[in-house]
């Protein structure tokens, strides 16, 4: 328990704590979902309800191909392209405007370096969009056409059909898809390592650097000397395995519940 609540990480003094990597992992994954879920929902709704038939398949394939891009490409793009642009043009504006808001302004404080917790979460959000959007699209397609056509026949708009027909019918699968994206974000290594800053510190400001479990393992496992140092890194890996396993197991159970419900309806 002391390992989980200790924020110190000092290999020289042989003092190790998992609080900072756990904090960085959970915060970046949360930011990724805040960014990725609305965009994924919009993409899935467009592909299933609004997109012309001749464009539906090409756009769907394009979204799925984005999931195949190696994570190191996202990380290098984030470090060499996005981070400098973000530090020069967006971060100062966010610090001046959002940082002045009482309460939540503390979240938008930090050095305008372009790398940090917020940037890592943003890159993760871009990475999980193809996964969540693909699952949501497949889930929306299992809604019986008769239900949607009946709603349209009563004069409902597209948004009303999605809100009152599609989402209630597929809410279990939607949550499962979101948790599947969360599992992807929790276990991401290379993209986060490039842009999170790799500093063992906890700060309220999202623009400050921090660290994640996967980044700690990638950066330090090869150079770990001493039994205690190696044991701390292995325990970090076990913590990440447990968190990811629970999230992915819950998502699979929710998707199985959706399929079981679909079978009962048919």
State where each predicted segment sits:
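Periplasmic/extracellular loop-to-transmembrane helix junction in inner-membrane transport proteins
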Residues: 1-32, 52-53, 110, 219-230
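Membrane-interfacial helix termini and adjacent extracytoplasmic/periplasmic loops
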Residues: 1-16, 76-126, 207
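Transmembrane alpha-helix signature in integral membrane proteins
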Residues: 19-46, 178, 240
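Residue-level signal for discrete positions within transmembrane alpha-helices
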Residues: 21, 25, 61-64, 68, ...
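Transmembrane-helix boundary motif in ABC transporter permease subunits
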Residues: 32-63, 76, 252-260
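Transmembrane alpha-helices
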Residues: 65, 69, 132-144, 152, ...
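Alpha-helical transmembrane segments of multipass membrane proteins
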Residues: 130, 243-251
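Interhelical loop and adjacent transmembrane-helix boundary motif
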Residues: 192-241
């Amino acid at each position: 328990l002391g390992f989980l609540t200790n924020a110190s990480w000092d290999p020289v003094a042989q003092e190790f704590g998992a609080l900072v990597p756990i904090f960085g992992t959970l915060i970046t994954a949360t930011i990724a979902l805040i960014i990725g879920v609305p965009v994924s929902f919009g993409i899935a709704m467009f592909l299933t309800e609004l997109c012309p038939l001749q464009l539906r398949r090409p756009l769907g394939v394009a979204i799925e191909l984005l999931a195949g891009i190696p994570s190191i490409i996202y990380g290098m793009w984030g470090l060499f392209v996005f981070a400098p642009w973000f530090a020069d043009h967006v971060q100062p504006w966010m610090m001046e405007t959002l940082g002045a808001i009482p309460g939540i302004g503390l979240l938008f404080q930090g050095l305008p370096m372009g790398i940090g917790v917020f940037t890592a979460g943003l890159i993760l959000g871009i990475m999980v969009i193809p996964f969540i959007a693909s699952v949501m699209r497949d889930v929306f397609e299992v809604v019986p056409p008769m239900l949607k056509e009946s709603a349209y026949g009563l004069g409902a708009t597209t948004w009303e059909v999605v809100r009152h027909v599609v989402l209630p019918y597929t809410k279990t699968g939607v949550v499962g898809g979101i948790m599947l994206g969360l599992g992807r974000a929790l276990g991401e290594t290379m993209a986060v390592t490039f842009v999170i800053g790799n500093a063992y510190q906890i700060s309220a400001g999202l623009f400050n650097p921090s660290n994640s479990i996967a980044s700690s393992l990638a950066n330090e496992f090869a150079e770990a000397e001493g039994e205690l140092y190696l044991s701390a890194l292995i325990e970090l890996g076990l913590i990440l395995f447990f968190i990811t396993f629970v999230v992915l197991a819950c998502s699979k159970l929710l998707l199985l519940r959706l399929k079981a419900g679909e079978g009962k309806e048919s």
